[in-house]
């Protein structure tokens, strides 16, 4: 079975790192990107198949729900 590809998006680096450490314990998960930048996340999704996005909904300067809609529209 191919590992699930995951993006972690949170503005706090320590939160991103903590989530990644937890996910790395599972060999069926590959973290493709850790970022606090919505543009970087969208670029990654455009260029790579991603199975799951872990997204902080309280992002400074970014409407997380609008970002979710953009992500959904990329996959249509």
Task: Please identify what each model-predicted range represents.
Residues 56-57:
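Active-site residues of response regulator receiver
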Residues 65-76:
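Short amphipathic alpha-helix used as the core "switch/output" element in two-component signaling
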Residues 3-14, 19, 23, 53:
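Conserved acidic segment of CheY-like receiver
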Residues 60:
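The feature encodes the CheY-like receiver
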Residues 30-36:
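Short beta-to-alpha connector loops in regulatory alpha/beta signaling domains
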Residues 23-24, 71:
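Hydrophobic C-terminal alpha-helix "anchor/cap" residues
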Residues 36-52:
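Acidic, metal-coordinating helix/loop segments flanking the phosphotransfer/catalytic sites
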Residues 37, 63-66:
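Acidic catalytic/metal-coordinating carboxylates
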